[in-house]
A protein has these predicted regions:
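Basic, Lys/Arg-enriched alpha-helical interface segments
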Residues: 1-64, 73-77, 84-110
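Portal/gating segments that form or line small-molecule/metal binding sites
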Residues: 67
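Conserved Hanks-type protein kinase catalytic core
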Residues: 70
C-alpha cells in the first residue's frame, strides 16, 4: 500500500471540513493507496496543474470540495492542495497555488 504525504496547508484544509467531507476524502485516498484507480465523478486528471495530478471531487448537500493529489512518486501519494469550489471552472488562482505547493512538497519546502 502506498504512503500519503500531505502539504501542511492541504492537511489543515481537510481537517477543517465537515465530518462527512473528511470521511469521503479519507475513503477515496485509502482506495488510491490500495492501487484502485478512481474515475469520474470522484476523480479526474488535472494536467493543467501538472502531469500525474488528479483532482478529488467531493460534495455534500452544502459544499463542493476539491483536493489535488499526485501519484507519480514511487510508493507515495502527495496531497498538496484543497479548496472549496464555487465556480464551474477551476479558478486559475487555485491551479497556480496547486502548482506552487506541489513543487514545495516535491522539493522539501513547506
Amino acid at each position: 500500500m502506498k504512503s500519503i504525504t500531505f502539504h501542511p496547508k492541504a492537511l489543515a484544509f481537510i481537517r477543517s471540513q465537515s465530518p462527512t467531507i473528511k470521511r469521503e476524502i479519507g475513503e477515496a485516498l485509502r482506495d488510491v493507496q490500495k492501487g484502485i484507480s478512481l474515475g469520474l465523478p470522484l476523480s479526474r486528471p488535472m494536467p493543467t496543474v501538472a502531469s500525474g495530478v488528479h483532482e478529488l471531487r467531493v460534495r455534500s448537500a452544502t459544499t463542493v470540495v476539491r483536493v489535488f493529489y499526485f501519484v507519480k512518486v514511487a510508493d507515495t501519494i502527495v496531497v498538496f492542495h484543497g479548496f472549496q469550489k464555487k465556480t464551474q471552472k477551476t479558478p486559475a488562482q487555485e491551479i497556480a497555488v496547486g502548482q506552487q505547493r506541489l513543487q514545495e512538497v516535491l522539493h522539501g519546502h513547506d
